[in-house]
């Protein structure tokens, strides 16, 4: 059940996300920790992007989203390295990473995100002094996890929740680069307008659905944790 995109379920007339806001619980204990933390306004954001020939729109995504936050930091390509990342993670409300991602089924703790100089693994994330309430992993397969005894998720989600995040936006499969840019623009515009995370993601998905009806394009991302 962990891999079912409930927001993309279709009843023959509509997809579930068209009629309701949907968020996913990471597990009772983790969710309790997420909901216990006081809410903060999303004022300071860190946008990190590493592009290449397979994901050429990452630069546009990173720079466009950063302009929505007057108090933001952008690390793009060469500056998006592990050292620079660790300088800023303790003093932000939002962390957005746009890059390549990979899930390691044989060892989920080595699932990772591609920075400019190295892969950022789950073990690395555990050691970050992360102060961001919202973490968006705009990459492939960032929401895929292995289910351990006790319904514990082993993967990137576990790392970022352990590091202190309250809400994660993750992906279930390989995402379409250009469509992801448009979805993220709409998502952050809705947040900036005061919408809840669940409402913002729903609006973004419905907007993409109008242009690209197939669920492959609009439904890979889902919200986990506080909504």
Residue ranges of each PLM-predicted region?
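Catalytic cores of enzymes
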Residues: 1-227
């Amino acid at each position: 059940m962990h891999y079912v995109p409930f927001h993309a379920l279709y009843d023959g007339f509509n997809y579930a996300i068209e009629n309701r806001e949907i968020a996913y619980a990471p597990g009772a204990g983790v969710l309790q920790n997420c909901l216990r933390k006081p809410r903060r306004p999303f004022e300071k954001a860190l946008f990190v992007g590493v592009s290449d020939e397979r994901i050429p729109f990452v630069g546009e995504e990173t720079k466009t989203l950063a302009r929505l936050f007057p108090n933001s930091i952008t690390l793009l390509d060469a500056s998006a390295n592990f050292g620079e990342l660790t300088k800023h993670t303790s003093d932000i409300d939002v962390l957005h990473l746009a890059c390549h991602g990979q899930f390691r089924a044989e060892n989920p703790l080595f699932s990772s995100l591609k920075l400019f100089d190295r892969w950022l693994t789950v073990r690395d994330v555990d050691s970050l002094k992360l102060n961001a309430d919202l973490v968006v992993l705009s990459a492939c397969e960032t929401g895929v996890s292995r289910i351990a005894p006790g319904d514990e998720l082993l993967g990137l989600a576990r790392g970022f929740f352990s590091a202190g995040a309250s809400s994660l936006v993750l992906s279930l499969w390989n995402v379409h680069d250009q469509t992801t840019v448009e979805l993220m623009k709409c998502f952050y515009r809705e947040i900036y307008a005061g919408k809840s995370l669940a409402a913002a993601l729903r609006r973004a998905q419905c907007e993409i659905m109008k242009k690209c009806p197939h669920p492959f394009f609009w439904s890979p991302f889902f919200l986990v944790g506080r909504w």
